[in-house]
Swiss-Prot record:
Matching SUPFAM superfamilies: HemD-like
Gene3D superfamilies hit by this protein: 3.40.50.10090
Transmembrane segments: none
Protein name in UniProt: Uncharacterized protein RP474
Native species: Rickettsia prowazekii (strain Madrid E)
Highest taxon in the source lineage: Bacteria
């Protein structure tokens, strides 16, 4: 059974798993949430000064979904559009697409509601207001450290044979640790026992990629990912990890859905 390292927050990881399940792939999922979000106090009245709103993240859309917004809304991504409903007048594939189609005469009448971390600046005349903070992981969770310990231990055939020969250990340790059919099977070890690995790593932002590389370097773990395939949302994200991991592919149009397509194309091989 091949394994996938999921790097977004737990809610987004679970949504990703549901999308992957549509492709009927039998995968083991490893949760490593590199980011978490903190909603800030937000005075909705500041929007009264603007006729247009730009939203490029699903989390920002969640914050605004319960408000009766009167402005025209420009978004990135279909899921963001679904959260905000009929007031969305344009849905872009990515930020570059949105900027290309956004009328320049609306810049001074527009506010961009975002996090403290953005991957691409909008034109200067567009106002920006931060409505939530993105915080990145400072150390790897114990569960991820244990995952790499398993890879380290079972990378040597002699250790795998010793484990198989130990009947008590083989039957009592490393049992299934997650039993939710909607999320697929999660095992600390693959069954039947074989060489352990993390086969795929999904990366959705430059900051997540930088965080992952930093944590792997801190723990001297990059050597165990040289056979892994990183699937990045863009060329910029791919270029961050390429000096450290040799197998990297990326999406041409920066679409989260295309990450899953690339996963499917490589996992079925």
């Amino acid at each position: 059974m091949k394994s996938v390292l999921l790097t977004r927050n737990i809610q987004e990881n679970n949504e990703t798993i549901q999308e992957i399940n549509k492709y009927n792939l039998d995968l083991r999922y490893i949760h490593c949430s590199l980011i978490k979000y903190k909603t800030l106090d937000f005075n909705i009245n500041i929007l009264n000064n603007y006729s247009n709103i730009i939203i490029t993240s699903k989390y920002a859309a969640h914050i605004l979904a319960d408000y009766n917004l009167k402005q025209d809304i420009w978004v990135v991504g279909n899921k963001t559009k679904q959260l905000l409903g009929k007031k969305v007048i344009y849905t872009a594939n990515n930020i570059a697409d949105l900027i290309q189609h956004f009328p320049t005469d609306l810049y001074k009448h527009t506010i961009y509601l975002s996090s403290n971390e953005i991957t691409q600046d909008l034109p200067n005349k567009i106002a920006r207001h931060i409505i939530y903070n993105v915080e990145y992981l400072n150390e790897l969770p114990i569960s991820i450290i244990q995952e790499f310990e398993n890879i380290r231990y079972f990378s040597k055939p002699a250790y795998r044979n010793a484990f198989k020969a130990n009947t008590i250990r083989a039957t009592t340790a490393y049992k299934k640790v997650f039993n939710d059919p909607s999320l697929g099977s999660t095992y600390p070890l693959e069954v039947p026992l074989g060489k352990m690995s993390i086969d795929f790593i999904l990366l959705y932002s430059q900051n997540s990629a930088k965080t992952l590389v930093r944590l792997l370097l801190q723990n001297n773990l990059l050597q165990y990912l040289q056979d892994s395939l990183v699937i990045a949302i863009s060329l910029k994200v791919a270029n961050i990890v390429r000096p450290f991991i040799k197998n990297v592919v990326y999406c041409d149009n920066q679409s989260p859905h295309d990450i899953i397509k690339l996963l499917y194309e490589n996992a079925k091989i």
